[in-house]
Amino acid sequence: MARVAVLGGTFDPIHLGHLAAAQGVLHLTGVERVIFLPNRQPPHKQGQPVTPAEHRAAMVRLAIADNPAFGFSDLELRRPGPSYTIETVRALAAEHPDWEPAFIIGLDSLLAIRTWREWETLMQSVDFFAVTRPGHDLAAARRLLAELGPRLSGRVRLLEIPGVAVASADLRRLAAAGYPLRYLVPDPVARYIAEHRLYLRGESHGDG
């Protein structure tokens, strides 16, 4: 079985913070690869506009192309409807029976995990790496793990990983204002955004 970590996200756009988190997980956990898995429609963002999947997938592929330890999966992009993690876990097991996956999530996602679909089944099925930057208060996360008990909390590992304090929503606002994204996203991604005029005010990139 290949031990892999799965980093799901909207990646709208992918940025250096995502890549730093993935590299940190590689270094700290001993997984063989990190698989980037863009989602079609995150359940917590239903109704919000999302850049078409082909653009987001292209940006992820460009961002990870120079790292052989990074891989790409379009599994969620091939499935209609919201991307629920429990369904992804089952689909990955069917599509990649040789993988032993763990999921990379942010600390905010860990704190909200009891709102996820079939969350107890999910936590019994896979391990989680909950990542945060050094210096963040972990008290709330530790309280949650204590409440979950050893059976479920044993599936979670808290990881402090140095990274870039940037959010995709902020990058979209910066791009809309004409601010250069160089040094915030990989250079090939910055060029792709510019070439395809993504995130500019008044530009439409919707699927319809």
UniProtKB/Swiss-Prot annotation:
| HAMAP family (UniProt xref) | NaMN_adenylyltr
Q: Which NCBIfam families match?
A: cyt_tran_rel (TIGR00125), nicotinate (nicotinamide) nucleotide adenylyltransferase (TIGR00482), PRK00071.1-3 (NF000840)
Function text: Catalyzes the reversible adenylation of nicotinate mononucleotide (NaMN) to nicotinic acid adenine dinucleotide (NaAD).
Keyword Iron applies:
no
**GO MF annotations, alphabetized:** ATP binding; nicotinate-nucleotide adenylyltransferase activity
Q: Which family does it belong to?
A: Belongs to the NadD family.
InterPro entries the record matches: Cyt_trans-like, NadD/NMNAT, Rossmann-like_a/b/a_fold
Lineage start: Bacteria, Bacillati, Bacillota, Clostridia, Eubacteriales
The protein's annotated pathway: Cofactor biosynthesis; NAD(+) biosynthesis; deamido-NAD(+) from nicotinate D-ribonucleotide: step 1/1
What's its EC?
A: 2.7.7.18
Catalysed reactions, as listed in the record: nicotinate beta-D-ribonucleotide + ATP + H(+) = deamido-NAD(+) + diphosphate
One GO BP annotation is:
NAD biosynthetic process
Task: Supply the alphabetized keyword list.
Answer: ATP-binding, NAD, Nucleotide-binding, Nucleotidyltransferase, Pyridine nucleotide biosynthesis, Transferase
Entries under Gene3D superfamilies matching the protein: HUPs
* Signal peptide location: none
Q: What is this protein called?
A: Probable nicotinate-nucleotide adenylyltransferase
